[in-house]
């Protein structure tokens, strides 16, 4: 099955999750591609499309919303999934798609209903932020 994971990341943590999914998938060999590099992507050739996106300062990248808007009809005809990477998912009460506020806002804003939805706790890498 031809499969792709398209991801949006800021510090690389979402990309690491995508690579982990790809290396641990027994049924699929995913192509893993940054949302920044999909300008000429022929998305209709894939049977399974996964979109992974991280939250930065409370928001997804605008490219994530643009992607869903541009490809929603194709996504709905394919096997698809969406996962969010965000820090609040570290809290038990926000660790499920049904209780994660970022996923709920995303679903409402895009009016897309992915066939599978996941949420992963994000990483806050304080030492690399160079506050001082």
What are the residue ranges of the model-derived segments?
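Short beta-to-alpha linker loops that shape the active-site pocket of alpha/beta-hydrolase fold enzymes
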Residues: 9, 36, 86
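FMN-binding flavodoxin-like domain, especially the glycine-rich phosphate-binding loop
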Residues: 24-33, 48, 57-132
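Structured loop/turn residues at beta-strand edges in well-structured enzyme cores
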Residues: 1, 44, 112
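N-terminal beta1-alpha1 ligand-phosphate binding loop
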Residues: 2-27
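Redox-cofactor binding/interface segments in oxidoreductases and associated redox assembly factors
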Residues: 51
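Short amphipathic alpha-helix with an adjacent loop that forms part of the alpha/beta core around
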Residues: 38-45
